[in-house]
Amino acid sequence: MYHTVVIGGGCLGAATAISLQKKLHKINKKEKVCLIEKSVLCAAESSRHSGIVRAANADNDASIMASLSTDYWSDLRKVWGVEMETEKFGAIWIAKNNQDGENPVWEELSERMKKINLVFEKIDKNSTIEKCSDTIITSDSEAYYYEPAALQIDPSILRSTIYDALDDSGVDVMEKTEVDIILSETSTITSCSTNNGIIKGKNFVNAVGAWSSHLFSKIGLKIPVTIEPVSVVNWMESPKQIKHEYPIIADYTNLCYFRSWRGNKLHAHQPRKRSVYEIAKNFINDLCAMNGGEYLNEPMNQSLPYNQIKNYEDIASKRFSN
């Protein structure tokens, strides 16, 4: 019997398994952690998270946690016992000024970030161009802020690092293992039935994500899940125009994030609306719906309709001269 069974081998599930197993080692417990994944670990990592790690946030608590996360990713050996290369290119945030040529919301945000020792500083157009080259289109009507601590993670490197950390910590990994049924006695989950047999555990962690409601509804647990569809596009670019060492561009004028991949690819995705109305609408449709789950962050441009790809192209043309 395992101390803990983590169901779901995405980034969060894998990180949970690694941390739990290391904690058990630290307190001299000989018990084991098992990580179950229906396909292979972090299969959607390249498209789903875009590898952007930044901390500036309107919510102070979120900023503090994100800043800690940045520190952990930068020195992963202290946390997981393995090293990982990160790309520290920083991030440039862009937003419209008001009629007076100011952006009081971001000015106030910059001051609040100072109080938690996070640099989110206003820069001028010339500094922006210096950091990005003349490929970026700037305007006097916009405000530019620089977050030097923001970093990028290459998803393929992250995936390899997760496998190394799981091996290093001694987690039992079961890939291509699909959970059919969660088994319980009274109100306690005791085991799960899979295509590779029954797996027993004292504790179970739900890291299934969008499919949680489907899996756990069989034992009467209602887990509300709603997902806002987000699609991404990737363009091949010339290294003479957009270099790999390009800052993350958080473009709130055109509502789009840009980052450069290795091999001179330009990645773009639009931020989620995080609208209370939109989320409520999804919940009204189905309290436990996987609404949009099958479309979430498709990595291939071919999966998007032409008008959506064209939308990204139009946005990119407003920000980049090439």
Mark where each language-model region is:
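Beta1/beta-strand and adjacent pyrophosphate-binding region of the FAD-binding site
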Residues: 1-12, 34
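Conserved Rossmann-like nucleotide-cofactor binding loop
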Residues: 12, 41, 211
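Short, well-ordered alpha-helices that flank and scaffold nucleotide-derived cofactor binding pockets
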Residues: 18, 22-26, 160, 164, ...
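Active-site substrate-recognition segment that forms the wall
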Residues: 18-22, 54, 81-90, 203-322
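Glycine-rich FAD pyrophosphate-binding loop
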Residues: 21-46
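Dinucleotide-binding Rossmann-like beta1-alpha1 core, especially the glycine-rich loop
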Residues: 50-131, 141, 255-258, 293-296
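Short beta-strand to alpha-helix junction loop
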Residues: 60, 64-67, 93-105, 145-164, ...
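Helical element adjacent to the flavin cofactor pocket in flavoenzyme catalytic cores
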Residues: 145-203
